[in-house]
Amino acid sequence: MRGLEKQGPSATAAPCGCAQPALETGNLLTEPIGYLESCFSAKIGTPRQPSICSQSRACLKIRKSIFNNPEHSLMGLEQFSHVWILFVFHKNGHLNYKAKVQPPRLNGAKTGVFSTRSPHRPNAIGLTLAKLEKVEGGAVYLSGIDMIHGTPVLDIKPYIADYDSPQNLEPQTKHHKLRAAGPSDATANSCDQQLLSGCEKAQPCHSTKEKPKCREHRTSDENSQKFRDTSEIQHTLPEDRERAVDLALESSREETMDEPEDQLGPQELKSFLEEGTDRPRKVEGALVLRGSSAETRWDASCHARTADRVPCSVVPSWVKEAPVATLQVRFTPHAEMDLRKLSSGGASQTSFKYFHSAEEAKCAIEAMLSADPRSVYRRKLCEDRLFFFTVDIAHVTCWFGDGFAEVLRIKLASEPVEVADPEESLVALGS
């Protein structure tokens, strides 16, 4: 009947009316694998994206209640440079959410919640790409983070550029595929019909097959080997020359041959060619088309194909050219003096826990303030108020002017500053 749709598995209701946890329905009870130890103690001032402040650092220790030997779960992770961190926005304050949100980057304009990274979502889950500094035992040390101290972490996944980063796609006319004629030709590349939103025209899906090396990327040994193989094959019979060229170009990738091809005599080479007529025709570096005298070489057109590629990752203009301008950051002489005193440490003073020096702490503060961490409310209605935040052990007080932010004072933060009501963190300028 019309109007009927296939329904998924229905959730089993508990006596209280709530849906019971079930893997098939997606109703899960999550358990954090650990709680983050971060240089950011509160939401105020924390970067909204991990790329804003590369100096920010954090440590995640895997809980022993998850694994008896946490270090076993991290085995092999040290071989990656970056990791995905899946976490919970545990400081939202409420579980309410709306279909449209006002991200600070849009300076008051509304857009759909799923087109943003707003923490107020149906499932308050965040995703961060962080740099992996090191792995020690059951602890992971990260940098370039945007999560606050005590954030519950749900999962860690390695970042793999070949899988996680969009690849440049080649126009369909540039694809050279050599296969036997048959009905499979019409359906072999069905993904070519997919459209990329924001691109000028349809592009074929990216193939995960290994692409041939460009000529300029080959080593001298590879080039000399191919030259010797090709020159020796010129003395073979004309009818076998096509297959001989195919063999020579393919020999660089064949690891099962008992002896190199340049040690074969003309008769041995001819007999070997006659035995391997059913060999696949796809080779690295070149393609020889049967029934045609022309040879289509991939490496010759590699540079031209690269110029014709169209990037498949498209973002709206408000992401790259946001209405909120980047601010200039300056420090008063007293603030710079406070920062040097704070980094000197001493017997009665605590030094930085996450930053390595005062200069690094200064760079982190500049990066955070240049992105304007204020909310839209504070930008429009609290322009004459001081703004302060905590990073590492530094409690920073600053104010914002027309296109700049100025750091007025930096003092030791005895305890993490966590303000429940945002209005409590506003102090009248001059008071």
Swiss-Prot record:
UniProt binding sites for S-adenosyl-L-methionine: P47, R48, Q49, H90, K91, R117, L127, I148, H149, G150, T151
GO molecular function (one): tRNA (L-threonylcarbamoyladenosine(37)-C2) methyltransferase activity
UniProt biased composition (Basic and acidic residues): 207-243
EC numbers on record: 2.1.1.-
Enzyme class: transferase
Pfam families: TrmO_N
Region (Disordered): 167-189, 201-243
Main function: S-adenosyl-L-methionine-dependent methyltransferase responsible for the addition of the methyl group in the formation of N6-methyl-N6-threonylcarbamoyladenosine at position 37 (m(6)t(6)A37) of the tRNA anticodon loop of tRNA(Ser)(GCU). The methyl group of m(6)t(6)A37 may improve the efficiency of the tRNA decoding ability. May bind to tRNA.
Protein family membership: Belongs to the tRNA methyltransferase O family.
Protein name per UniProt: tRNA (adenine(37)-N6)-methyltransferase
Organism: Rattus norvegicus
Name of the gene encoding the protein in the UniProt record: Trmo
